[in-house]
Amino acid sequence: MSKIAVYPGSFDPITMGHVDIINRISPLYDEVIVLVAQSSQKQSMFSVEERKTLIEKALSHLKNVKVDIFGGLTVEYMKKAKAQVIVRGLRAVSDFEYEMTMANMNRKLAPDFETLLVFASPEFYYISSRGVKEVAINGGALKGLVPDVVVEAMENKIRK
């Protein structure tokens, strides 16, 4: 049986913190699925299709990583994908409470799945998608905060 992990999120946009976590977990699994959440509750800078494309370009160096879009419960997607592990990143202590609640909810819904919490590397712990959007909107430098392909896409989006 293949070891498959799912890393769900909105990834609007994918940041270097996300890329770092994916780089670090990809050697641990046969397949890592970056699952782009389709949410009508959030105002997004990029459509889910644009996010999927940007992530694919940013992670093209990782051959065991694929990107997919899903609009339902992560555990339902995991059943279809035959995945065993949900990966979540932790930047700060404040993330822990939310992630613990979600992990326990997922365990209630699907007792066979595990949640792997991965601490952000120190050089990326301060980066968030929301913060990156603020920097972009206010004309700040995005280099090092997001992959180069995302820098270009964000600059083009803001110019419009």
From Swiss-Prot:
Keyword field: ATP-binding, Coenzyme A biosynthesis, Cytoplasm, Magnesium, Nucleotide-binding, Nucleotidyltransferase, Transferase
Binding-site list for ATP: 10-11, 18, 89-91, 99, 124-130
Reactions that this protein is recorded to catalyse: (R)-4'-phosphopantetheine + ATP + H(+) = 3'-dephospho-CoA + diphosphate
Source species, domain of life: Bacteria
Protein localization: Cytoplasm
Cofactor(s) recorded in Swiss-Prot or TrEMBL: Mg(2+)
GO molecular function: ATP binding; pantetheine-phosphate adenylyltransferase activity
NCBIfam families: coaD_prev_kdtB, cyt_tran_rel
Subunit structure: Homohexamer.
Name of this chain's protein: Phosphopantetheine adenylyltransferase
Organism listed in the record: Bdellovibrio bacteriovorus (strain ATCC 15356 / DSM 50701 / NCIMB 9529 / HD100)
Lineage, opening ranks: Bacteria, Pseudomonadati, Bdellovibrionota, Bdellovibrionia, Bdellovibrionales
Annotated gene: coaD
